[in-house]
Amino acid sequence: MRRILIVVLLLAVIAASVGFIILKTQSLSDDQNFFNRNFRSKFAANEFWRAIFGLQSSGDARADYLGSRYKKVLIEVDIMQGLSAQISGLDALKDKIQKITGKPTDYIISDRAVRYYRDLDTELIDDLVDQYQIRETSGDTALIYLLYASRSQEDAGFLGLTHREYGIVLFEETLKEFSREDPGILANYEVSTALHEFGHQLGLDHNDRPGCLMNEEVEIGRFWERPEDVILDFCEFELQQLGFNR
């Protein structure tokens, strides 16, 4: 009897291990596989399981921002040497994130300048974030990490992108080119691009709807001539996707 029990336990351990390996492998894929369709959002809502399965893609920290566990949001801002952030843009971004999350939101600008690189690929961005990021989601505060960087090596037209499940990268030199150095348009471009990337961190995908913030044109840039023409809020369709019935 004892031998049978040991065999059963060993088989259970083996089955559990194999199951974990299969799910772990699927969790690392961007495909709409069984795990991602049925379990990813559930596991990602819990920090422990998020760490176990290595869930660090856009949208995996959605529950941190929209759930009830964290009561505040903090934006940690790092700026590459030679670049600058529009304070009016940061103030507006803070207010808009506070409105969408329903949580008091603030930002803090690091006093350390990030080493300048002319072009950035994903690997270099990872290295810079690992080197310069100080804070993390903890206590009652969910973190958003915002990096003002130079430009994308992979696509010179990219205005911004997401980093892991909590970060936003703004390509400031590209934003300045698209805004033609107009401070009013530049600040709104920064807000629009950052909020678009935050939408991805809330789990929103691109759409092709005119006037919607998650329209892919916001990410790759388009020439708005006036500050008031820049899209600065989620549209009704996107709010419904986030669970806001208005």
PLM segments and residue spans:
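The catalytic-center signature of Zn2+-dependent metalloproteases
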Residues: 3, 181-246
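Residues embedded in well-ordered secondary-structure elements
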Residues: 64-66, 135, 203
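Short, histidine-centered active-site or binding-site loop motifs used for metal coordination
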Residues: 77-81, 174, 218
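Metzincin-family zinc-dependent endopeptidase catalytic domain
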Residues: 87-193
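N-terminal low-structure segments adjacent to metalloprotease catalytic domains
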Residues: 1-117
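Generic structural signal for residues positioned in beta-strands
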Residues: 74-76, 145, 167-169, 212-213
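Residues that flank catalytic or metal-binding motifs in active/ligand-binding sites
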Residues: 33-39, 71, 142, 164-166, ...
